[in-house]
C-alpha cells in the first residue's frame, strides 16, 4: 500500500495556525509555532487510517507561521505494515496563508492546493478527507 500522508492541510498539507491571544479578531497576530495536538480527538501518536494490514499513524507535526503570511510545516508519519514493517515518512511543505476573521486558508507553494480551517482560542481546527478517510486535526500555539 502506498504511504498514506497525514495531510491535514492540503497541498502536501499546508499547515495551520492559531491566534496569539484568545481573540479571533482580524488584527490579532497568528504568527508563531504550532504543534499538532490531536487527530480525530486522539493525542499523538494517533492512528489515522487502517486498511487491511496497513496502519497510518501521525507521530508529530510542527507548523511555523510568519508575520508576512508564509508557512513551513514538518510532519512525521509512519506506515505500519504486516508485510514490510514500519516505515517512517517525513514531509516538509511550505506556502502562504490568508486570514479572514476566524477562518484561515493555507495554499501549498508546490501543488497550489489549499485548505481552510477555523481559528479559536490559540488553536486551529482543520477537517479534510484523506484517502477516503475523514481527518480532523487541531494545532495549538506554543
Language-model region placement:
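Bacterial N-terminal signal peptides that target proteins for export
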Residues: 1-8
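C-terminal motif of bacterial Sec signal peptides marking the signal peptidase cleavage site
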Residues: 14-18
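Lipid interaction determinants
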Residues: 20-142
Amino acid at each position: 500500500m502506498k504511504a498514506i500522508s497525514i495531510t491535514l492541510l492540503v497541498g502536501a498539507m499546508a499547515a495551520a495556525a492559531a491566534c496569539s491571544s484568545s481573540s479571533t479578531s482580524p488584527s490579532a497576530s497568528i504568527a508563531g509555532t504550532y504543534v499538532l495536538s490531536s487527530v480525530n480527538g486522539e493525542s499523538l501518536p494517533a492512528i489515522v487510517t487502517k486498511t487491511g494490514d496497513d496502519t497510518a499513524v501521525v507521530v508529530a507535526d510542527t507548523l511555523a507561521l510568519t508575520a508576512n503570511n508564509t508557512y513551513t510545516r514538518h510532519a512525521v508519519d509512519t506506515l505500519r505494515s504486516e508485510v514490510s514493517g514500519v516505515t517512517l515518512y517525513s514531509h516538509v511543505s511550505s506556502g502562504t496563508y490568508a486570514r479572514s476573521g476566524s477562518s484561515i486558508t493555507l495554499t501549498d507553494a508546490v501543488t497550489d492546493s489549499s485548505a481552510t480551517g477555523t481559528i479559536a482560542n490559540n488553536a486551529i481546527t482543520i477537517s479534510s478527507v484523506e484517502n477516503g478517510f475523514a481527518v480532523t486535526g487541531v494545532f495549538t500555539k506554543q
